[in-house]
Amino acid sequence: MIKNLLNKRKYITVSSVELNDTELSEDEKPNIPSGMWSKCEKCAKILYTEDLRENFNVCPNCGHHFKLGAYERIKYLTDENTFVEFDKKMIGRNPLDFNGYEEKIKGYQKKSHVIEGVVTGEAYIAQRKVVLCVMDSNFMMGSMGTAVGEKITRAIEYATKNRLPLIIFTCSGGARMQEGIYSLMQMAKVSGAIYRHGRENLLYITVLTNPTTGGVTASFAMEGDIILSEPGCLVGFAGRRVIEGTINEKLPDDFQTAEFLLEKGFIDKIVQRKDLKQVITSLLRMHEVDYE
């Protein structure tokens, strides 16, 4: 008996290879709902998606700002149930008969749950009425085509007519190549509407989000009276490799970041997403004018 007590207990060993090769049946597989967990693109930490949403879609570990859909951003920013959307059914056409373009638009509409690359409308922020344009990178990387340009222009004209402050959240890969020159002309059209809005001494705030590039950067993104940005945003016109290849020089590591632009005086302030509503409210209050 004593001998048995002193003997080491023996275990049946199973190799990890055998375990890894074993196929679990459907009943044995863990039932984890799709979308329950998210992985941070910067620090690779696995995050509970509900906690991430409660933290404004910002990683609590490293502060990385996840991409936000247009309607999510509007929900975070505006007073509850005050947003009224403009031109809800306006979608892009295919002016150049670009092969497969209509199918691509339909695919992105299904995938992103928006019908175009921008959502526009009016809402209240801290009980102050504003006009909002929020670009959505989930739809063709927020590229600017005729529908995007037209929706933004109409929203600006509405703000001008009703003497309202204008806030545009930019997020774009630039002009939409499938629409060619029709896409490029939106830069001038939107900029003209911005000019007329400014001529009436009305406030225009831009908020740069990741990424803001190409024709959007070269036009209305950098025309705001006040230019804010979320941390770590890519902001530029041409791509890094294109510039380095053209000038045959190595660019700084922080080139085309919001922090670099702040240092050089191109933007006014970098704001954490959780603080955006408070900062914008303060700006609206400072520039408040009674026109009656």
UniProtKB/Swiss-Prot annotation:
Coiled coil: none annotated. It is found in: Cytoplasm. It catalyses: N(6)-carboxybiotinyl-L-lysyl-[protein] + acetyl-CoA = N(6)-biotinyl-L-lysyl-[protein] + malonyl-CoA. Residues 36-292 form the CoA carboxyltransferase N-terminal domain. InterPro entries: AcCoA_carboxyl_beta, Acetyl_CoA_COase_Trfase_b_su, ClpP/crotonase-like_dom_sf, COA_CT_N, Znf-ACC. A zinc finger (C4-type) spans 40-62. Binds 1 zinc ion per subunit. Keywords: ATP-binding, Cytoplasm, Fatty acid biosynthesis, Fatty acid metabolism, Lipid biosynthesis, Lipid metabolism, Metal-binding, Nucleotide-binding, Transferase, Zinc, Zinc-finger. Signal peptide: none annotated. The keyword Ligase does not apply. Its EC number is 2.1.3.15. Component of the acetyl coenzyme A carboxylase (ACC) complex. Biotin carboxylase (BC) catalyzes the carboxylation of biotin on its carrier protein (BCCP) and then the CO(2) group is transferred by the transcarboxylase to acetyl-CoA to form malonyl-CoA. This is Acetyl-coenzyme A carboxylase carboxyl transferase subunit beta. The gene is accD.
